[in-house]
């Protein structure tokens, strides 16, 4: 058992009393920080940075050295699993991630195997271990994975997509093939996240970035079903410590009750739903994470403080809230505005945790 200097984030996820609302930011180690860009240049490219545990550790800690954040998140990419499956991940300048061998043929789909994280994804586990050591129990470390459906989107489309034409065609014409991809990928995510926990991750998060593109029925069948499988297979305790988990579907505000039923400890919210409404609907049975529009960070300190105040007031008194953005921080965000966000959350939230 290790004693964290700051366990506010873990306590909030477990809906335990805290003195203030903890805060971290999705993509907090990223291109908006000059020091990140310098480290990335040393690595050569983004993928080389992800696969170098020493440099991944360096960039993971950079935002914590600037801001009083309450958690660190592993610096990696959601597409490590399909890359380890042999699809050939690469990054094109200005185009984002792409796969050399997207899944289009039935034979390729049925040959998918669950990669061994101890061999094919060793660099991720080494990074988790190194980051934990470098953090020296300052704050907890979050591990993560993409959701099966979001990973499948990239695996079938071969890249980002505006219309999801390839995967939705498969969904409606050959659902059996898509279910096979999702089944294998769900098992891979379980093994991958449990390996991260064994290596030192103290909480884990599933990013369902593209689940919100599905219809109501399709979301239940092709996204949430497999995330529920993951919830059932995840380690909930390691070294006598609870390992909480967060499930985030971008555009998932329609399905909060169903997401809660998956068995997750916390639901991540994007900025399109009022957090107070989300709290009423989930009845304090799960923690909530979110949900500032990242574009607010392009505005003034006064506007940032006002928008933070609205979210804190909407959530209201009591525990179970982790403040975050509703999606990843933009590369164009002034770092001083991120600092304003973190400090404002800490300062304004104390009021909501005081016992009257």
UniProtKB/Swiss-Prot annotation:
Annotated metabolic or biological route of this protein: Porphyrin-containing compound metabolism; protoporphyrin-IX biosynthesis; coproporphyrinogen-III from 5-aminolevulinate: step 4/4
EC number: 4.1.1.37
Domain of life: Bacteria
Keyword Cytoplasm (UniProt): yes
Keyword Ligase assigned: no
Stored InterPro entries: UROD/MetE-like_sf, Uroporphyrinogen_deCO2ase_HemE, Uroporphyrinogen_deCOase
Keywords assigned: Cytoplasm, Decarboxylase, Lyase, Porphyrin biosynthesis
Recorded catalytic activity of this chain's protein: uroporphyrinogen III + 4 H(+) = coproporphyrinogen III + 4 CO2
Binding site for substrate: 27-31, 77, 154, 209, 327
Signal peptide: none
GO cellular component: cytosol
Site entry: Transition state stabilizer: 77
Family: Belongs to the uroporphyrinogen decarboxylase family.
NCBIfam families, A to Z: hemE (TIGR01464)
Role this protein plays: Catalyzes the decarboxylation of four acetate groups of uroporphyrinogen-III to yield coproporphyrinogen-III.
The protein's name in its UniProt record: Uroporphyrinogen decarboxylase
Gene of this entry: hemE
């Amino acid at each position: 058992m290790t004693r964290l200097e700051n366990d506010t984030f873990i306590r909030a996820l477990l809906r335990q009393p805290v003195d203030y609302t903890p805060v971290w930011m999705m993509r907090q180690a990223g291109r908006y920080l000059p020091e990140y860009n310098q480290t990335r240049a040393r690595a050569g490219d983004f993928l080389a940075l992800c696969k170098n545990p020493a440099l991944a550790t360096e960039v993971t800690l950079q935002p914590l050295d600037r801001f009083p954040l309450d958690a660190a998140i592993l610096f990696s990419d959601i597409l490590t699993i399909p890359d380890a499956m042999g699809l050939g991940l690469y990054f094109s300048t200005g185009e984002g991630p792409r796969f050399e061998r997207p899944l289009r043929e039935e034979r390729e789909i049925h040959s998918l195997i669950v990669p061994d994280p101890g061999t094919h994804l060793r660099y991720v586990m080494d990074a988790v271990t190194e980051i934990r050591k470098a953090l020296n129990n300052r704050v907890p470390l979050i591990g993560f994975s993409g959701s099966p459906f979001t990973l499948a989107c990239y695996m079938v489309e071969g890249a980002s997509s505006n219309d999801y034409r390839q995967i939705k065609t498969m969904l409606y014409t050959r659902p059996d093939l898509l279910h096979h991809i999702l089944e294998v990928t769900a098992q891979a995510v379980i093994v991958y996240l449990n390996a991260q926990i064994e290596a030192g991750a103290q909480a884990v998060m599933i990013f369902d970035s593209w689940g919100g593109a599905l219809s109501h029925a399709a979301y239940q069948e092709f996204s949430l079903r497999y995330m529920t499988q993951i919830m059932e297979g995840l380690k909930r305790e390691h070294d006598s410590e609870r390992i909480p988990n967060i499930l985030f579907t971008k555009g998932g505000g329609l399905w909060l009750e169903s997401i809660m039923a998956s068995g997750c400890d916390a639901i991540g919210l994007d900025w399109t739903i009022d957090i107070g409404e989300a709290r009423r609907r989930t009845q304090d049975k799960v923690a909530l994470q979110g949900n500032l529009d990242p574009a607010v960070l392009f505005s003034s300190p006064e506007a940032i403080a006002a928008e933070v105040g609205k979210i804190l007031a909407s959530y209201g008194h009591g525990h179970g809230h982790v403040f975050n953005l509703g999606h990843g921080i933009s590369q164009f965000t002034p770092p001083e505005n991120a600092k304003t966000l973190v400090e404002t959350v800490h300062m304004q939230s104390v009021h909501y945790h005081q016992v009257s």
